């Protein structure tokens, strides 16, 4: 399954397309917040 943010999974593992992932993170801090349990940007 491709999650559309550079992360995609098959039956065995998940992988990250870092170029896509990084571009999405730069444009969408919500994605990073989801991956970090909501801690991104909260200092």
Curated annotation (Swiss-Prot):
Keywords: Antibiotic, Antimicrobial, Bacteriocin, Disulfide bond, Secreted. The keyword Secreted applies. Its main location: secreted. Disulfide bonds join 9-14. It holds the Pfam family Bacteriocin_II. Transmembrane segments: none annotated. Remains active between pH 2 and 10. One of its GO terms (cellular component) is extracellular region. It is found in: Secreted. Remains active after incubation at 121 degrees Celsius for 1 hour. One of its GO terms (biological process) is defense response to Gram-positive bacterium. Highly active against Gram-positive bacteria M.flavus strain ATCC 400, M.luteus strain CECT241, C.soprogenes strain NCTC533, L.monocytogenes strain ATCC 19111, L.inocua strain ATCC BAA-680D and S.carnosus strain LMG13564. Belongs to the bacteriocin class IIA/YGNGV family. This is Bacteriocin weissellin-A. The lineage of its organism: Bacteria, Bacillati, Bacillota, Bacilli, Lactobacillales.
